[in-house]
Amino acid sequence: MNNTLYRKKLSGTTLDYYDTRAAIEDIQAGAYATLPYTSRILAEQLVRRCNPDDLTASLEQIIHRRQDLDFPWYPARVVCHDILGQTALVDLAGLRDAISEQGGDPAKVNPIVPTQLIIDHSLAVEHGGFDSDAFDKNRAIEDRRNEDRFHFINWCQDAFDNIDVIPAGNGIMHQINLEKMSPVIQARDGIAFPDTCVGTDSHTPHVDALGVIALGVGGLEAETVMLGRPSMMRLPDIIGVRLVGKRQPGITATDIVLAITEFLREQKVVSSYLEFYGEGAASLTIGDRATISNMTPEFGASAGMFYIDEQTIDYLKLTGREPEQVALVEQYAKETGLWADSLTEAKYERVLTFDLSSVCRNMAGPSNPHRRLPTSDLATRGIAKEWTETNGEMPDGAVIIAAITSCTNTSNPRNVVAAGLVARKANELGLIRKPWVKSSFAPGSKVAELYLKDSGLLPELEQLGFGIVGFACTTCNGMSGALDPKIQQEIIDRDLYSTAVLSGNRNFDGRIHPHAKQAFLASPPLVVAYAIAGTMRFDIEQDALGVDSDGNPITLKDIWPTDEEIDAIVNASVKPEQFKSIYEPMFNVKVEMGEQIKPLYDWREMSTYIRRPPYWEGG
């Protein structure tokens, strides 16, 4: 239920909006100008939805930055992956049973808040990127293993109102949220308001890059929001992170985020909301910003926000959002003080400064994402050292998994294109992947396949063993699949120190694969380079990856692309029509169940995956 006070016409549109500035100024003149971006969005939803009797007290909490009282938060959407999202929907299906048994209408049990469920957590890379049929084989295995789950989820798509289901094989929840699902500014029932969401995954803040508050929550809290109840919260510490300087040539967004992760962990920003701003932030594309926002949980924070600005507008156009929606985002942000230029007087609990020009080529590891490892320090850190490669045997420190994976990096076209260019130069020079390396490429969006084909880089990646194995989380969430049995046995018999290199966001011991004793996070182009090197004992900046036809050593600098090369391909090959061609049909998919959908689920008594919740018995 929306309030009536402070509701006004949004100029240049047929929509209304809530004048949060006026509501704040009525309590304390001049206060709105000092509010951070996050506070302005939290205040808006209070003006729009809060009980009028509680509105003044709730807004005073935000104005005076009181953190000792709860206030209601009404997210606009719920986004779920298939693991926790499925659990929430099982609860709702059980509730339908209980209501039916009491003589009620089970069809009335539906999410009130729009809910989007994306199946992305269940695909394992059983077949690596060197298998030309890997995608089809991995998907077939996924469907076979998850038939019970997918049957239930498909029923939910048709049985419940207000739920969109994106079937398996279409991408990662966070990347689809960034590229399609978030409108940035909602327009419902004649009212424009900021998009916000909760998601059943810790990396839900990925879409903070668009200026959308998106928090990772557990399944129970997601259920609460689905059913229209507010999520009660206290005002967090809101910390400004001023980005200054300009990144050095050859530095990727991955290098930047790994350096920022180390920096912010040292600054102790646990549970804080971060707002990145300054000339450095303004220079970053949304792809770069998303790489940073995605690793918010690795910072220890709850949100990693960027302001709405021209980069936001450019990205919405690039990803095929409708012109009317793009215009609404700009108009609303400028009218309500959410545009970057309107936040120059914002006051924060703390302001931290990070210089982008200080970033060098980085990895993270072993074992922790905040354990930054400059590639220039591999020898001094004891990672790179003397090693020998005996014919027919794996070396010490063998890289057994090299995975271009995760929405952290595959939602950033510059990172993906850089990997393709490294592959192309490596192929031209005759370099090959080491045979013990299980390589894979799992983009978080089908759009990546289109622009890589358009640029001619997908065949280059495939030649090195980085063919597309799926559009899902895969190796990043531990679904790296089985190793070749001979390789696995050699690791066991020789007690080898074996490793994984991936473009993901977490590398805790044992997470990536039981036989990868440690794992390292790296940019997609570095992942390709390590597949060629084949061991972490290799000094990636200094050692020779191979020799050319004249016998000259080939090092990383010989295959690393320039920024100009990367940008030229991104500008020529990433197009709005690609996003439209992927997403327009995706959101119209209905899975044929072969029968008329009933309001009650027909529980499978022998299922070990999906069972009727026992706590509704006698409810």
Task: Describe the role of every protein-language-model region.
Residues 1-619:
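Fe-S-dependent hydro-lyases/dehydratases of central metabolism
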